């Protein structure tokens, strides 16, 4: 005689990604993939609010990243001229297509299957909306902000701690390279908190919705995104170190030397040896500084900037080369080249001129970093 199936107490599941029971209803069409960060927003009120806060116009083209089963998509289609849904999971792509199949909304929907981060660029659009897969939160923002013509508005759902970083202030523990970039290129507003119970399956963390409005036209800073971000990567590599220490790391010096030589070559400019005649700029050049040379011990509990886990390839290559040299021979103090001496003197000049030498990245706002970048440019030092 077959055994009677036992039900778990209070219909509890052993985990958020367990397979659904056969009789669980038509909405459980497949198992959600946690590798894709699939947490479907099931609260219609929040879906309405996300679309409402985008202030869509009938002429707008909307890009939605990760449409899932289409709960937000349908609402955007009702208001906009077109929605381009970018979906990594083919099953979800088929589901959102089926959602509007046979309706007038179908001709307004375009589905692109693929990873939005690996696309050459985000399709041109007026608005960007997303219940963002948390693992692509930072790359998605940087990709949007670096667009030549970014959307008018983006309404995005993020993990709560990540959202707090977007609106952090100088001195806050969550203040980061991400914070400075977003607030330099856009205005960011917190919209609402979203609890775990509003998703299926529920994530392990709470979420927040934010609205990002990039500066457009003449309001957009006349600075290359990669250039500003390159400076921030150096400053926030260790955000609790002084900027003087950050720019004394040997990998940073090597990068600045390389870029300075390229700049002089491209513009047919001779090396600026005049800075070497100023004793105040060359007094400490005999000290071979590196990441551990900063004597201020204000660590605040973090060693590396938590947002900058993707160290630039150039830094990695330099570190690997240095490690190979150390393994091959006993370290020795080689005499510095003239370019190296010039670049160190120029860095000292910039930090002294701007008055930022002894400030830490976590204490500086976007205007401080802009002042720093422009001063470096005056000395022929670039970061991209």
Swiss-Prot record:
InterPro entries tied to this protein: KsgA/Erm, rRNA_Ade_Mease_Trfase_CS, rRNA_Ade_methylase_Trfase_N, rRNA_adenine_dimethylase, SAM-dependent_MTases_sf
Residues noted as binding S-adenosyl-L-methionine in the record, renumbered to the chain: 39, 41, 66, 87, 115, 131
Localisation: Cytoplasm; Nucleus, Nucleolus
Keyword Methyltransferase in record: yes
Origin: domain of life: Eukaryota
EC top class, as a word: transferase
Coiled coil, from the record: none
An example Gene Ontology molecular-function term: 18S rRNA (adenine(1779)-N(6)/adenine(1780)-N(6))-dimethyltransferase activity
EC number, UniProt record: 2.1.1.183
UniProt protein name: Dimethyladenosine transferase
Originating species: Chaetomium thermophilum (strain DSM 1495 / CBS 144.50 / IMI 039719) (Thermochaetoides thermophila)
Designated gene of the protein: DIM1
């Amino acid at each position: 005689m077959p055994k009677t199936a036992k039900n778990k107490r209070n219909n509890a599941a052993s985990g958020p990604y367990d397979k659904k029971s056969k009789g669980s209803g038509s909405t459980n069409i497949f198992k959600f993939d946690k590798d894709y960060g699939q947490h479907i927003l099931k609260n219609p009120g929040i879906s309405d609010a996300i679309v409402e806060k985008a202030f869509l116009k009938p002429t707008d083209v909307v890009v939605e990243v990760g449409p899932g089963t289409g709960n937000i998509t349908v609402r955007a289609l009702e208001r906009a001229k077109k929605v381009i849904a970018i979906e990594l999971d083919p099953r979800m792509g088929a589901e959102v297509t089926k959602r509007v199949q046979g309706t007038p909304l179908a001709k307004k929907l375009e589905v692109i299957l693929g990873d939005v981060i690996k696309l050459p660029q985000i399709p041109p659009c007026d608005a960007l909306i997303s219940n963002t897969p948390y693992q692509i939160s930072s790359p998605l923002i940087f990709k949007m902000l670096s667009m030549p013509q970014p959307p008018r508005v983006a309404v995005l759902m993020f993990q709560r701690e990540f959202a707090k970083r977007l609106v952090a202030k100088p001195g806050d523990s969550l203040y980061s390279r991400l914070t400075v970039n977003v607030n330099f290129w856009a205005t960011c507003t917190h919209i609402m908190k979203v609890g775990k119970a509003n998703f299926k399956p529920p994530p392990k963390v709470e979420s927040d919705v934010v609205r990002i409005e990039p500066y457009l036209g003449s309001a957009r800073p006349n600075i290359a995104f990669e250039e500003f971000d390159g400076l921030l990567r150096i400053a926030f590599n260790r955000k609790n170190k002084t900027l003087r220490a950050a720019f004394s790391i040997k990998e940073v010096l090597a990068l600045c030397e390389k870029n300075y030589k390229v700049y002089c070559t491209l513009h047919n400019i001779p090396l600026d040896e005049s800075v070497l005649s100023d004793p105040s700029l060359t007094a400490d050049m005999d000290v071979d500084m590196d990441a551990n040379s900063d004597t201020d011990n204000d660590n605040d509990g973090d060693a590396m900037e938590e947002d900058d886990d993707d160290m630039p390839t150039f830094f990695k290559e330099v570190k690997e080369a240095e490690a190979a040299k150390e393994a091959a021979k006993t370290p020795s103090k080689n005499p510095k080249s003239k370019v190296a001496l010039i670049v160190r003197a120029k860095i000292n000049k910039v930090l002294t001129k701007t008055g930022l030498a002894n400030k830490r990245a976590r204490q500086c706002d976007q205007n401080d970093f802009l002042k720093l970048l422009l001063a470096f440019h005056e000395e022929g030092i670039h970061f991209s």
